[in-house]
UniProtKB/Swiss-Prot annotation:
Tissues of expression: Expressed in trachea multiciliated cells.
Cell compartment(s), UniProt: Cytoplasm, Cytoskeleton, Cilium axoneme; Cytoplasm; Cytoplasm, Cytoskeleton, Flagellum axoneme
Chief localisation class: cytoplasm
Functional note: Microtubule inner protein (MIP) part of the dynein-decorated doublet microtubules (DMTs) in cilia axoneme. Important for proper ciliary and flagellar beating. May act in cooperation with CFAP45 and axonemal dynein subunit DNAH11. May play a role in cell growth and/or survival.
Pfam families hit by this protein: WD40 (PF00400)
The name this protein goes by in its record: Cilia- and flagella-associated protein 52
GO biological process terms, semicolon-separated: flagellated sperm motility
Subunit field text: Microtubule inner protein component of sperm flagellar doublet microtubules. Interacts with BRCA2. Interacts with the CCT chaperonin complex. Interacts with HSP70. Interacts with AK8. Interacts with CFAP45. Interacts with DNAI1. Interacts with IQDC.
Keywords: Cell projection, Cilium, Cytoplasm, Cytoskeleton, Flagellum, Repeat, WD repeat
Record's keyword annotation contains Repeat: yes
């Protein structure tokens, strides 16, 4: 928890950065994507934040308040309240936050559960909120929304069964709800005068099932349970008996991970392998179906369900019209750690990011994905645009350098076996004739790029460990490489040999030339930002870059007046270069920041993080 406590001291004297946009969606949260009852907004989690995204415009609102990743989200039937739960460390209290939707602010913080909040549900008339604790907690608690306090609690499952993982309220009565999980299905009655909840175990006979998802019919006649086996159970909440199960054959692959009842009858079912199906009881055979990318974790209706939204584990949000059952991808993002971000030379209109198995090009103002280049089962560690804009050069962990056309994503050429233990860093010269790459074994290699050929000019062997960052001087006669062996080396690119070496007791993660190119700034795991003389490699000054974690990314403006840093303390910091003071701090990331860039023309700062999020900030000074 120390990473959450310490940033407050630094934020005190610095001005807060203005967050303009977030590209990101945590698709791993079960039923995390919700369509608000006003039918104009989507609500979904990203790290510790909850995003309220307007469906028809680019407008976004952010709910900040959780100290750790959000694990569940619920919206009341009236749309007045949003509730969200989080995970935390073992033995610590995990908070539930009740938000006022209209004012977009925190109303109450409800703390009782330990470790994790598994699921949340509102009663139909906004009277109660029921919460389910995680495996270390195992309790179910009913909260009064008016008084904002707990009414009563109870262990969620019996002694000889597994944990309960899902909860749903009755659609008509404020006193009944259902919990289900590993081998347990319970219907609960709330007894308000005695402040107790009474469970009744549902009988499924010989069937033993682990419940993944749950949905209640509009008139409370039945509720449906999706299981890891890939079938659906239909239960009667009054008799607590099994009505029917299905499908008998062709069960849903990787389990029924999302389920949703429609008012007109029938079910929408999402499976763990990305199949979206419309089916009806009792056969549960697919009437309509489409295949989506990534396991489906959320299905949420817009209004009565003529249109609905689907969220998948690969951070895709689809809009589907029920009548023609065709999907439209409306939001997408990286679902793994983003390794690098880069702007093309001289334009801030678009930028590229890379992560596991793909490179994506984004339109800056609309947050739209323009292009996706996929290389299956590989991780891209670094990218750079050639100065002429004709190719994107990328560094991959299979030891290859790949070049792609930025408009089409066509593979232009591959340099095989560029490095032994993967390519970890890459840079290009401004005359577009050379590519400089760094590898996991510590070699720095200079490649000559011709019209049809790619030739190795020199392998520079000095570093003992992986190269983390490469920057080239404007004149293309010199470059600096930072390595995790604790050295930064300045190379002469004309004679292809070492000019100067900088030693420090740290794993260097990032390096920048000052625009006047007589100084460099470095940072890394010792949290210090150091200024060095290029000429003799002597240290000029050291600043404390962060109080709590490594600094992973850094970029400097063209004028050299300000620079930005980001790292494991999840904060974006803008620094005055000469004073060495933090002028602005950006709070919003919930994963470790991996890389950060200032756009050409100093309009935006774009930072990327290990949870797959891309954040765009307004550059605080007039350009």
């Amino acid at each position: 928890m120390e990473t959450q406590a310490s940033p407050k001291d630094e934020v005190a004297e610095a001005v807060e950065l203005e967050l303009e946009a977030v590209i990101g969606f945590n698709g791993h949260v079960p039923t995390g994507l919700k369509c608000h009852p006003d039918q104009e907004h989507l609500v979904y989690p990203l790290g510790c934040t909850i995003l309220i995204q307007a469906i028809n415009t680019q407008e976004q609102n952010f709910l900040h308040g959780h100290g750790n990743n959000v694990s569940c989200v619920a919206i009341s039937k009236s749309g007045l309240y949003i509730a969200s739960g989080q995970v935390t460390f073992m033995g610590f209290k995990a908070d539930i936050i009740l938000w006022d939707y209209k004012k977009r602010e925190l109303m109450a913080r409800l703390s009782l559960h330990k470790g994790k909040i598994e699921a949340l549900a509102f009663s139909p008339n906004d009277m109660y909120l029921v919460s389910l604790g995680g495996p270390d907690d195992g309790s179910v608690v009913v909260w009064s929304i008016a008084k904002r306090e707990a009414i009563c609690g109870s262990p969620a499952a019996g002694l000889n069964v597994g944990n309960a993982t899902t909860v749903i309220f009755s659609k008509c009565r404020d006193e009944m709800f259902v919990t289900a999980g590993n081998g347990t299905i319970r219907v609960w009655e709330l007894d308000l005068p005695n402040r107790k909840i009474w469970p009744t175990e549902c009988q499924t006979g010989q069937m033993k099932r682990i419940v993944m998802s749950i949905s209640m019919a509009n008139d409370d006649s039945f509720f449906y349970l999706g299981t890891t086996t890939g079938d659906i159970l239909k239960m009667n909440p009054r008799t607590k008996l099994l009505a029917d199960t299905g499908p008998a054959k062709d069960k849903f692959s990787l389990g029924v991970s999302a389920i949703c009842c429609l008012k007109m009858g029938g079910l929408l079912v999402g499976s763990g392998d990305g199949l979206l199906v419309f089916c009806k009881s009792p056969s549960y055979k697919p009437i309509k179906k489409i295949q989506l990318q990534g396991g489906i974790t959320s299905i949420t209706l817009r209004g009565e369900g003529h249109q609905f939204f689907v969220g998948t584990e690969e951070s895709h949000i689809y809009r589907v019209n029920f009548t023609n059952f065709k999907e439209t991808l409306i939001t997408t993002c990286h679902f793994e750690s983003v390794e690098d971000i880069v702007f093309p030379f001289g334009t801030a209109e678009l930028f590229a990011t890379c992560a596991k198995k793909d490179i994506r090009v984004w339109h800056t103002l609309t947050n739209r994905e323009l292009l996706r280049i996929t290389v299956p089962n590989m991780t891209c560690h670094g990218i750079d645009f050639m100065r002429d804009g004709k190719s994107i050069i990328s560094a991959w962990d299979d030891g290859r350098i790949r070049a792609f056309a930025p408009e089409t994503g066509r593979l232009m050429y591959v340099i095989n076996n560029a490095h032994r233990i993967g390519v970890t860093a890459i840079a290009t010269t401004s005359d577009c004739k050379r590519v400089i790459s760094g590898g996991g074994e510590g070699e720095v290699r200079v490649w000559h790029i011709g019209h049809q050929t790619q030739k190795l000019e020199e392998a520079l062997k000095e570093h003992k460990s992986s190269v983390s960052c490469i920057r080239v001087k404007k004149s293309n006669e010199e470059c600096v490489t930072a390595s995790t062996d604790g050295t930064c080396i300045i190379w002469d690119l004309v004679r292809l040999r070492r000019n100067q070496m900088i030693l420090a007791n740290t794993l260097f993660q990032c390096v920048c030339y000052h625009p006047e190119e007589f100084q460099i700034i470095t940072s890394g795991t010792d949290r210090k930002i150091a200024y060095w003389e290029v000429f003799d490699g002597s240290v000029i000054r050291e600043l404390d870059g962060s109080l709590s974690g490594a600094v992973n990314g850094m970029d400097i403006t063209v004028e050299g007046v300000h620079f930005v840093t980001g790292g494991n303390d999840h904060l974006v910091k803008v620094w005055d270069y000469n004073e060495g003071e933090v002028t602005h701090v950006g709070v919003g990331h919930s994963g470790n920041i991996t890389r950060i860039r200032i756009s050409p023309g100093n309009q935006y700062i774009v930072s990327v993080s290990a949870d797959g999020a891309i954040l765009r900030w307004k550059y605080p000074f007039p350009s």
